[in-house]
């Protein structure tokens, strides 16, 4: 991945900027066919373009049937950045969403991601329940 190549070549510390791309997306997600149709986008062309870009970077990318609201996952990502080794959550969320087509707005999916990278699941539940990193994402 480009960022890893940059880190190897230069003494840099990446900072991820979170932003809610489609905050109106409901908790259950939106069907991609409808999502594209509302925007006049050819779904096959959009997939082919993204797949080509991801292949070029060596990133896995799968076809998804739905788009999901990632706001809470972003808040959890901000929290993870404050934890030792927490940066690994970003790749895990990428894989859950863009490879596994999982709803990363679902609490149990998020907790599974937290567990998969070895972070404290109870602390993560508290972060989500109390929205502790809402302001941090808003400020990004």
Predicted regions and their residues:
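Thioredoxin-like thiol-disulfide oxidoreductase module
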Residues: 53, 126-140
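Conserved acidic, metal-coordinating active-site core of Asp-based
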Residues: 87-131
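Structural alpha/beta surface segment adjacent to cysteine/selenocysteine redox centers
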Residues: 2-100
């Amino acid at each position: 991945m480009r960022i890893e190549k940059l880190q190897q070549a230069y003494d840099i510390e990446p900072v991820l900027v979170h932003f809610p791309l489609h905050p109106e997306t409901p908790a259950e997600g939106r069907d991609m066919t409808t999502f594209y149709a509302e925007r006049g986008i050819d779904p096959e062309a959009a997939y082919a373009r993204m797949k080509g870009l991801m292949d070029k970077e060596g990133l896995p990318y799968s076809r998804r049937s739905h788009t999901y609201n990632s706001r809470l996952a972003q808040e959890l990502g901000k929290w993870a950045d404050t934890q030792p080794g927490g940066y690994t959550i970003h790749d895990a969320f990428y894989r859950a969403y863009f490879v596994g087509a999982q709803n990363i707005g679902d609490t149990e999916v998020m907790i599974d991601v937290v567990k998969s990278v070895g972070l404290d699941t109870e602390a993560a539940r508290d972060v989500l329940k109390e929205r502790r990193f809402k302001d941090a994402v808003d400020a990004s």
